[in-house]
């Protein structure tokens, strides 16, 4: 039961985690770009 639940959650969380880390890195890049101006 738990294994089946995890096997369904983990593959769904991977793209969300990648997208979230990409957005955070982009926002930090934009913030640093604004500080340079």
Swiss-Prot record:
GO cellular component assignments: cytochrome b6f complex; plastid membrane; thylakoid membrane
Superkingdom of source: Eukaryota
The keyword Nucleotide-binding is annotated on this UniProt entry: no
Membrane topology, as annotated: Single-pass membrane protein
TM stretches of this protein: 5-25
InterPro entries: Cyt_6/f_cplx_su5, Cyt_6/f_cplx_su5_sf
Compartment(s): Plastid membrane
Subunit comment: The 4 large subunits of the cytochrome b6-f complex are cytochrome b6, subunit IV (17 kDa polypeptide, PetD), cytochrome f and the Rieske protein, while the 4 small subunits are PetG, PetL, PetM and PetN. The complex functions as a dimer.
Physiological role: Component of the cytochrome b6-f complex, which mediates electron transfer between photosystem II (PSII) and photosystem I (PSI), cyclic electron flow around PSI, and state transitions. PetG is required for either the stability or assembly of the cytochrome b6-f complex.
Family in the record: Belongs to the PetG family.
Protein name: Cytochrome b6-f complex subunit 5
Biological classification of the source: Eukaryota, Viridiplantae, Streptophyta, Embryophyta, Marchantiophyta
Gene it is expressed from: petG
